Swiss-Prot record:
Source species of the chain: Homo sapiens (Human)
UniProt keyword annotations, A-Z: Acetylation, Cytoplasm, Metal-binding, Phosphoprotein, Ubl conjugation pathway, Zinc, Zinc-finger
Binding site for Zn(2+) 2: C154, C157, C175, H178
Residues that, per the record, bind Zn(2+) 1: C14, C18, C30, C33
Protein's name according to its UniProt entry: AN1-type zinc finger protein 5
Length: 213
């Protein structure tokens, strides 16, 4: 019995076609189909050769057969779980391949859509013919003339006064003798200026008219 339980048969599908793995000890059927088969035989009163042999054996043989059925059921469930995990892992393994294909297609589209950059050719500029420069004499003529320093002289006697000269309102410079208006016949009208200044400082005040009621 110990040798039989230690031997693990190769995986094989159930003979009834349910999709689970069968066991040669249960006539090539899975544990569920085998239990249904035994129930049918008990109901119909027909016992298979394996069923009669199991019935003639002691209660210990019945418990051993039940344990075998349970182990076969566990093996079938483990095999089914492994197949489901493999089927789930297949799209996960194939996922990087699809990503690579999509990336390759995107890169090809980018290469097609991106325009070719035009290579800018170096522009060669030819030196323009040298223009004849004007002579130094013309440049000197065009240069602005520096203002001559004004000599401080009296407008009447042409005496050098320097910084001691007097500016008159007529716009001329005079010495100490000719600084007065009666000495150099000043054309400036002092009377008109004084009258305008007086009118500005002393405006005419007119009382408001009385309105009759």
């Amino acid at each position: 019995m110990a040798q039989e339980t230690n031997q693990t048969p190769g995986p094989m599908l159930c003979s009834t076609g349910c999709g689970f793995y069968g066991n040669p000890r249960t006539n090539g059927m899975c544990s569920v189909c085998y239990k249904e088969h035994l129930q049918r035989q008990q109901n119909s009163g027909r016992m298979s050769p394996m069923g009669t042999a199991s019935g003639s054996n002691s209660p210990t043989s019945d418990s051993a057969s039940v344990q075998r059925a349970d182990t076969s059921l566990n093996n079938c469930e483990g095999a089914a779980g492994s197949t489901s995990e493999k089927s789930r892992n297949v799209p996960v393994a194939a996922l990087p391949v699809t990503q690579q294909m999509t990336e390759m297609s995107i890169s090809r589209e980018d290469k097609i859509t991106t325009p070719k950059t035009e290579v800018s050719e170096p522009v060669v500029t030819q030196p323009s013919p040298s223009v004849s420069q004007p002579s130094t004499s013309q440049s000197e003529e065009k240069a602005p003339e520096l203002p001559k320093p004004k000599k401080n002289r009296c407008f009447m006697c042409r005496k050098k006064v320097g910084l001691t000269g007097f500016d008159c309102r007529c716009g001329n410079l005079f010495c100490g003798l000719h600084r007065y208006s009666d000495k150099h016949n000043c054309p400036y009208d002092y009377k008109a200026e004084a009258a305008a200044k007086i009118r500005k400082e002393n405006p005419v005040v007119v009382a408001e008219k009385i309105q009759r009621i």
